[in-house]
Design a protein with these regions (language model features):
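Pore- or pathway-lining transmembrane helices of multi-pass membrane proteins that form conduits
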Residues: 50-57, 102-127, 236-248, 264, ...
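Transmembrane helix-bundle core of multi-pass membrane transporters
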Residues: 103, 111-179, 206-209, 271, ...
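Alpha-helical transmembrane segments within multi-pass membrane transporters and channels
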Residues: 71-118, 125, 172, 260-265, ...
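Transmembrane alpha-helical segments in multi-pass inner-membrane proteins
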Residues: 78-79, 208-218, 222-289
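Helix-loop-helix "hairpin" substructures at the membrane interface of multi-pass membrane proteins
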Residues: 152-231, 255-260
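Single transmembrane alpha-helix segments in multi-pass membrane proteins
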Residues: 14-62, 95, 99-109, 127, ...
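Membrane-interfacial amphipathic/re-entrant helices at transmembrane-helix boundaries
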Residues: 1-30, 58, 70-80, 107-112, ...
Length: 307
């Protein structure tokens, strides 16, 4: 096939598959946050990508501080910087929900327009603070290089790290939603807001924490993003369409659907863009998803919701 031997073709497919897993990990983190905000709360957050950018810039600032003032901590700073990225994105998300989103519940068109305007404002703030050019964080040495399971296959260590972060965050979110009192409040508010309020749940505070949590997870996605690409003011907006596709295709209130959808879309794009052009690969993936959604509008998985 195209001058490739079977061994070469196998190595290419494995590396493209792993590249798809790296994309899957970032998409998964982005989609997890959006699934909580959009799926659990019904809020269309067009600024979700900018919260990813906040996390990425938080990593960049931490790398500058570590390399300039604390060089001895440079090999270890990245783990702490991920936590900082989460806290910063969480805090900004909390403020946005309190100042803007809470006034727009049950007004989806107004929410869409308001968050779209917010995304443009945030992008301009990024340009004013960090400049229009893309920046890169200084990565620790243990994130550099590749693992070679065979002489013809190279698997980047940063991709393995991104996958590990994605798995840990996914497990943490599942435990939070299904094994904690706060997760019980979130699910109760989603299923029946009036009844949840009647039994004493502060639904306004639950909404605020839920929205902030989704933004914080997007911040972690931004932290993971810095290991595989440079960061610019519009980096997050490049992922927002794919992220909405993941959530809608998987089922808006299903975490399992989000997992399956992110994996399917990432692998399809990674493999198709190798055999086609980048644009054709994405178009083919999008058209396939549209056809499937025409046949199954509720997505891959559905969740029972009481009204």
């Amino acid at each position: 096939m195209g001058g490739y031997s079977m061994a070469d073709l196998w190595a290419i497919l494995v590396m493209q598959g792993f590249s798809g897993l790296s994309l899957f990990s970032v998409l998964m983190l982005m989609a997890l946050g959006l699934a909580i905000i959009f799926g659990q709360m019904g809020v269309i957050n067009m600024a979700h990508g900018e919260f990813m950018t906040i996390g990425a810039y938080a990593i960049y600032v931490c790398s500058k501080v570590a390399s300039t003032y604390l060089p001895a901590l440079l090999p270890y700073y990245f783990v702490f910087a991920i936590a900082i990225a989460f806290v910063v994105a969480f805090g900004v998300g909390y403020a946005v929900e309190y100042l803007l989103i809470r006034h727009l519940y049950r007004r989806p068109l107004d929410t869409l327009l308001a968050t779209w305007g917010l995304s443009l404002i945030m992008q301009q703030v990024f340009r004013s603070v960090f400049g229009a050019r893309e920046v890169s964080a200084t990565l620790p040495n243990w994130l550099m290089g590749a693992w070679k399971p065979t002489p013809t296959i190279d698997i980047p260590l940063n991709g393995l790290f991104v996958m590990l972060v994605s798995v840990l965050v996914t497990l943490a979110v599942v435990l939070f939603l299904y094994r904690s009192n706060w997760g019980l409040r979130v699910r109760a508010t989603t299923q029946n807001r009036v009844m949840a309020r009647a039994v004493g749940i502060n639904t306004s505070r639950t909404d605020r924490i839920t929205f902030a949590l989704g933004c914080g997870i997007a911040g972690i996605a931004g932290a993971a993003f810095t290991t595989i690409a440079s960061t610019g003011p519009t980096s997050g907006s490049l992922y927002i369409v794919d992220t909405f596709l993941v959530v809608v295709f998987g089922g808006t209130a299903s975490l399992m659907g989000t997992l399956a959808s992110a994996f399917s879309i990432a692998q399809a794009q990674s493999i198709l863009t190798f055999f086609m052009t980048n644009a054709m690969g994405k178009v083919t993936t999008l058209l396939t998803i549209i056809v499937i959604l025409m046949l199954r509008p509720e997505g891959l998985f559905t969740a029972k919701v009481r009204r």
